[in-house]
């Protein structure tokens, strides 16, 4: 089984990362997106065929977690996912 990658935050930067991964050949089955806005969930599922879940579930299931949120939101996101993070996971911050 390939490693799971989660993208938490699906704004412009998060979607750009997602789009690049899909275009480069990454299987959508190996990608999870954490997004809280209902309209974005539907949009991303229809456009890319990815699984969109809550942030905590995405972080729990993934081997690599890309945090693509605004700096002022980072503390809240980290507090939300901290209980499910485990040794060996790779966290990448793309906060901007």
Positions of PLM-derived features:
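Rossmann-like NAD(P)(H) cofactor-binding subdomain of soluble oxidoreductases
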Residues: 38, 47-48, 55-96
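NAD(P)+-binding Rossmann beta1-loop-alpha1 motif at the extreme N-terminus of oxidoreductases
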Residues: 1-56, 60
């Amino acid at each position: 089984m390939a490693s799971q990658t989660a993208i938490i935050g699906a704004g412009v930067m998060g979607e750009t990362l997602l789009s690049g991964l899909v275009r480069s050949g990454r299987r959508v089955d190996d990608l999870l997106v954490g997004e809280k806005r209902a309209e974005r969930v539907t949009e991303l599922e229809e456009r890319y065929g990815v699984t969109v879940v809550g942030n905590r579930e995405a972080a729990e299931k993934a081997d690599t977690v890309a945090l693509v949120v605004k700096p002022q939101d980072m503390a809240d996101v980290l507090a939300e996912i901290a209980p499910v993070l485990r040794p060996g996971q790779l966290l990448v911050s793309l906060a901007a």
